[in-house]
A protein has these predicted regions:
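N-acyltransferase acceptor-side catalytic subdomain
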Residues: 1-387
């Protein structure tokens, strides 16, 4: 392979579905073309929202070939805020401001609005991934200088990518999430038997309260999610944000679009009072994992969030033999429900030498605190001790 050529493109449509998915695949719902294009097409990732597409496309030709083929892609956005990232750098932005400098724009490689780890740099088997990463890094440094961008942030890459990017000079950061693992359970009751008596009783009590209220649940696979479901779901979705004085990042058109373009990776769990939907949660899935992402309800019903978003999701994983369940960022209340702490990763390059050193020192100091937090969280897990 020789004559590598890198382009920054302002729309994933410039690369195209076949080309992008040819490298990225479709198993990860948040990095497949359909998801990223739906965000862009419906106005969720645009310059006005602070997520301007700036995707990376690398082309190369084999010695005997006359034309160049796409050999690598990477999602990239030029950002003018830090919303929808879930790796928090607001304090860094404030520090820049205190010194009369601008932290924005910055570059971010991520699945927008999605705190879920996965591959971020997709390469053809004919090229060396480290070489491609180095090329992107070099070109991005040049682009950052020309656009006066402060930094580049790679959010929720795999552990292997985190190490690769760190090796070429992009600082590494860790954080913690809580995921549930399906250890070949045949039923939810079998899972409960792995918990200590007190936690098992607490979960049963919570579920019993929901049942006594007469609430029932229905799982709607993606192809069967109709306009009426999207309407009520979107009302709930926005109400969740409104309670915090915010507006949801995503439009109803976005949800309708992914419902059309990738229904096989979606399912919705709705809670019913008689025939009336009183809550809804939208999940994604791939061949091994479920991802709980968005939820809302008509009002605050005790334990309904836990049932709809966690217990129903766990039951779905058991029934469909999915190996794990990523229910989103944060949430220490998940620990007592069997969600285990896992490490997540990010990488950060800072253009300003002074700030780069300060942030590097911060990351070094932060890492043992994250490890200690993860250990403490693991010590609180409700599983029975092996005798």
């Amino acid at each position: 392979m020789n004559d590598l050529r890198l382009e920054f493109v302002d729309s994933i449509a410039s690369i195209g579905e076949e080309q992008w998915n040819g490298l990225a695949g479709k198993d990860n719902p948040f990095t497949r073309y359909e998801f990223l294009w739906a965000l862009e097409k419906t106005g969720c990732t645009t310059q006005s929202t602070g997520w301007e597409p700036y995707h990376v496309a690398v082309y190369g030709s084999k010695l005997e070939a006359a034309t160049q083929n796409l050999v690598a892609v990477m999602p990239l956005y030029q950002k003018t805020n830090s919303y929808g990232e879930y790796v928090f750098d607001w304090s860094w932005a404030s520090a820049y401001q205190n010194y009369g400098l601008s932290y924005y724009p910055k570059f971010v490689s991520a699945a927008p609005f999605t705190p879920s780890h996965g591959t971020r740099l997709f390469t053809d088997e004919s090229v060396n991934k480290t070489d491609i990463a180095q090329l992107i890094f070099e070109k991005l440094q040049e682009k950052a200088e020309s656009l006066d961008a402060s930094s580049w942030h790679i959010l929720f890459p795999t552990k292997e990518e985190n190490e690769l990017f760190e090796a070429i000079g992009i600082g590494a950061r860790t954080a913690c999430q809580f995921h549930w693992f399906n250890r070949d359970y045949s039923s939810f009751d079998e899972f409960l038997q792995t918990l200590n008596s007190r936690k098992r009783k607490n979960i049963k009590k919570e579920r019993q309260k929901i049942a006594e209220r007469g609430t029932t649940f229905e799982t709607i696979e993606g192809a069967n999610i109709g306009p009426q479901h999207w309407d009520i779901f979107y009302q709930f979705y926005q109400s969740t944000y409104m309670m915090r004085g915010m507006q949801g990042y995503l439009s109803q058109d976005f949800f309708i679009e992914i419902g059309k373009q990738m229904p096989e990776q979606l399912f919705m769990i709705v809670a019913l009072d008689g025939e009336k939907i009183i809550a809804a949660a939208l999940f994604f899935k791939n061949s091994e994992k479920a991802f709980g992402r968005y939820w809302g309800s008509a009002r605050d019903y005790q334990f309904l969030h836990f049932e709809t978003c966690y217990y129903q999701g766990q039951e779905y994983c058991i029934a469909h033999k999915l190996k794990s369940f990523d229910s989103g960022a944060q949430g220490e209340h998940k620990i007592q429900r069997g969600f285990e702490p896992i490490t997540t990763y990010s990488n950060h390059w800072i253009a300003n030498a002074g700030f780069a050193q300060a942030i590097h020192n911060f990351l070094d100091e932060e890492k043992p605190h994250i490890e200690r937090y993860k250990e403490e969280a693991a010590s609180l897990l409700p599983f029975r001790k092996e005798s």
